[in-house]
Amino acid sequence: MDRAIDIDFRTISVVGLGYIGLPTATVLASRQREVIGVDINQHAVDTINQGRIHIVEPDLDMLVRAAVSQGYLRATTEPEPADAFLIAVPTPFLDNKQPDLSYIEAAARAIAPVLKRGDLVVLESTSPVGATEQLSDWLSAQRPDLSFPHQQGEESDIRVAHCPERVLPGHVLRELVENDRIIGGMTPKCSEAAQRLYELFVRGRCIVTDARTAEMCKLTENAFRDVNIAFANELSMICDEIGVNVWELISVANRHPRVNILQPGPGVGGHCIAVDPWFIVDAAPESARLIRTAREVNDAKPHYVLDRVKQAARRFKEPVIACFGLSFKANIDDLRESPAIEIVQTMVQQQLGTVLVVEPHIKVLPAALQGVELLNAEAALSRADIVVLLVDHQQFRKLDTDRLQSRVVIDTRGMWSAKRIAA
């Protein structure tokens, strides 16, 4: 019988136990498979083995506690033999906007010694086109006794595929199960093996393609969103110049049946939309002109917000600035590539005034924000001359906007402004 069809995936290893890896490992464990989570962060490993979590994601704590107590999930810092390996490590970009694949290479070096004939390796990390082939090459360099798809094609000992995550923070557990998945194997048998694995827990469609198309698919999805956000952000700056309320404008423009303008903000953050388009630009710099421009527009938006804060600060002798929200999107604790972090950090560096932060989803400010106070909303409002809304957390919607009347308000998300329009 074909090895791909015969594979049973009794033991599955997930390398990288962050915002994607840990929920994926937990969902697999809930299907009563033995799951070995691997992470270089000893604190994360210890926390998980105690049945607790080191990240914020709704309902994840209960599932991890159950999976660990039932013996289906455990974490370690060193890879162990398994039937399938899912790599979910970061893929940031370097200072020159080129992709940094060092985490993927490190994962390949870590799992290579425990690979055996018939194993499946899946790259889940969002990656530039060609990264899955590079992963196969790195693995083969460590294990010349095994054959890999870029060498032996369908007859390889090890199957290698790419299956990018496509989940929304705050809804990860539901979307891991319900969303369609794009599965791109380096060969048809690689795709078949990966499809078998994901069908253990995915209720959505598993759509099979090749590895390069799967890689480009995820980049395309995020570049599409980035371009549309850039349109909204640019529109907000134009409206400020010509004296039009952008929130009201978007609301009425979206009444057109074929118009759906997104909401502007202080920039674009997170580990996907703020990063992935650069992978396309790096691969085809002369052709990716619109994608590059969208990235530049969104990267420039924090500076635009800062200019507005500077103008407001000139009205006060010793301004106190309260910044509401630090995460890259609403209702999560993830600060990766957050424009709010950049804005607050620059306020401190440029000494615009006393800077306060309200971020209900974290207990300690990042080291980059030394000199900033973390307060609750009431304490911050009682001291603030200027209030800057950077993230539209649900908690901030409950704020009595009458409390803002005597303060300068810079609402980058339209949350309080929209309430006033509706009223």
Swiss-Prot record:
The keyword Transcription regulation does not apply. One of its GO terms (biological process) is lipopolysaccharide biosynthetic process. Keywords: Lipopolysaccharide biosynthesis, NAD, Oxidoreductase, Plasmid. GO terms for molecular function: NAD binding; oxidoreductase activity, acting on the CH-CH group of donors, NAD or NADP as acceptor; oxidoreductase activity, acting on the CH-OH group of donors, NAD or NADP as acceptor. It is an enzyme of class 1 (oxidoreductase). Its EC number is 1.1.1.-. Gene3D superfamilies: Cytochrome c1, transmembrane anchor, C-terminal (1.20.5.100), NAD(P)-binding Rossmann-like Domain (3.40.50.720). InterPro entries: 6-PGluconate_DH-like_C_sf (IPR008927), NAD(P)-bd_dom_sf (IPR036291), UDP-Glc/GDP-Man (IPR017476), UDP-Glc/GDP-Man_DH_C (IPR014027), UDP-Glc/GDP-Man_DH_C_sf (IPR036220), UDP-Glc/GDP-Man_DH_dimer (IPR014026), UDP-Glc/GDP-Man_DH_N (IPR001732), UDP_ManNAc/GlcNAc_DH (IPR028359). It comes from the Bacteria. SMART domains: UDPG_MGDP_dh_C. The keyword Cell membrane does not apply. NAD(+) binds at residues 11-28. Belongs to the UDP-glucose/GDP-mannose dehydrogenase family. NCBIfam families: NDP-sugDHase, PRK11064.1. PANTHER family: UDP-N-ACETYL-D-MANNOSAMINE DEHYDROGENASE (PTHR43491:SF1). This is NDP-N-acetyl-D-galactosaminuronic acid dehydrogenase. It comes from Ralstonia nicotianae (strain ATCC BAA-1114 / GMI1000) (Ralstonia solanacearum).
